[in-house]
Amino acid sequence: MSPKLLKILNDSYQAVKNDGEDVIKGLSRNLKSLPPKYFYDDRGSELFEQICELPEYYPTRTETSILEQYADEIAQITGSCELVELGSGSSTKTRLLLDAYQKIGNSFTYIPTDVSGGILKTSVLDLQEKYPDFTIEGLLGTYQQTLAYLESITTQSRTICFLGSSAGNFAPQEFDNFLTQITSCLLYTSDAADECLC
């Protein structure tokens, strides 16, 4: 039996309804805005991957450097766990962590999450081929949908990884709420040593 590829966390009617509400709310404000999730359809995700390779875009290089230096230590500290990556995109940087987990040989589950089904599906297929001993299943949905789903699932040990510059897409209060929701996801595990890598 082939492994599951994606779990879709929204039904299309509700997603369209919420999308319309988001657009109306954002464009009705004095300071017009749209939620960043609209940037990341298949084409937007592809463009962002290209932006990450530009010399001017330093966050990707900085995070890669940090992971190159500390991935083995992170894998040792977190051990056998469920690693959830919020906004995973192509999971390029995270492969450094996956390689480190592979070295220690513990049982391991990786759950990449994204709002772009195209890039998530491509990434999950590639990762399932490269890491056949890992359980890898993508979650398709927004951060809020992903975190709400994770709150309903109890697991032995969970590490949540939030890489990239997406924190800048939140208003301060929204980011506080986001971190609170991440904390709630970590409380729904049976291991007191859960981690959040931001």
Annotate each PLM feature.
Residues S90-I104:
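Conserved SAM-binding loop of SAM-dependent methyltransferases across substrates and taxa
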Residues D176-L187:
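A short glycine-rich, Lys/Arg-flanked "PGG" loop and its adjoining helix->strand segment in the class I
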Residues Y188-C198:
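Single conserved hydrophobic/aromatic residue that forms the stacking wall/gate
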Residues E82-G89:
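Conserved class I S-adenosyl-L-methionine
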Residues P35-P36, F48-E73:
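Class I SAM-dependent methyltransferase Rossmann-like catalytic core
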Residues S2-K37:
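N-terminal auxiliary segments of SAM/dcSAM-dependent transferases
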Residues R158-Q173:
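A short SAM/SAH-binding and catalytic strip from SAM-dependent methyltransferases
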Residues N106-Y143:
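Class I SAM-dependent methyltransferase SAM/SAH-binding core
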